[in-house]
A protein has these predicted regions:
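Core AdoMet radical
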Residues: 2-22, 34-51, 62-82, 90-123, ...
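Alpha-helical packing segments of well-folded alpha/beta enzyme cores
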Residues: 23, 27, 55, 121-124, ...
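Catalytic domains of carbohydrate-active enzymes, especially glycoside hydrolases
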Residues: 30-31
Length: 174
């Protein structure tokens, strides 16, 4: 990775510094001044970021959650942090949508996505379905890879079982 110019140490440090001093501060300011209308939580795993949980709680505390639309791309490996539960927060907001990343079901999904506990993912997804008021609030985000091609039928069956849509994207390896 260090051979790639955008990953070279000085640039990486500059980006991190910019993110920490500029981007995060602008986000915090937008929360505190109630100017945020939409948040798209993605990249890495947003539910692992303490900032996510603090910001969501703060928006509710400030009393303007009903004016904010919240979207996620998440692997749903976590749905709570320090006693705060995602699916208790989301109904407080104007609207929300979760696209949950999954590459396959069961052992195949666990093989493709390192760290996936499929049964835990399934419990978390069903927990979201229980609070969802519309079909688009909880969707499967299926990345089709070579091993994942073997999972097409299982993923379709899962979407039928859960009564949810599948959004697909193809992963190219070149």
């Amino acid at each position: 990775k260090d051979s790639q110019p955008w990953m070279a140490s000085p640039l990486r440090e500059q980006i991190t510094h910019f993110q920490d001093t500029q981007v995060v501060q602008e986000f915090v300011d937008a929360v505190e001044t109630k100017t945020i209308k939409e948040i798209y939580w993605c990249g890495g795993e947003p539910l692992m970021w303490e900032m996510h949980w603090k910001a969501m709680q703060r928006i509710i505390e400030l009393g303007f959650a009903k004016e904010v639309y919240v979207r996620y791309n998440t692997n749903l490996s976590r749905t709570s942090l320090k006693g705060i539960k995602l699916f208790d927060l989301l109904p407080e907001f104007q609207d929300w949508q979760i696209c949950s990343s999954l590459d396959g079901t069961g052992e195949v999904g666990e093989y493709i996505r390192d760290g996936l506990n499929y049964e835990q993912w399934l419990r978390n997804f069903k927990e979201g379905l229980a609070v969802a008021k519309t079909a688009r609030e909880m969707r499967l985000d299926y990345t089709i890879t070579m091993p994942g091609l073997l999972e097409l039928k299982n993923m379709f069956d899962l979407s039928q079982e859960l009564n949810t849509e599948i959004l697909t994207k193809v992963m190219f390896t070149f």
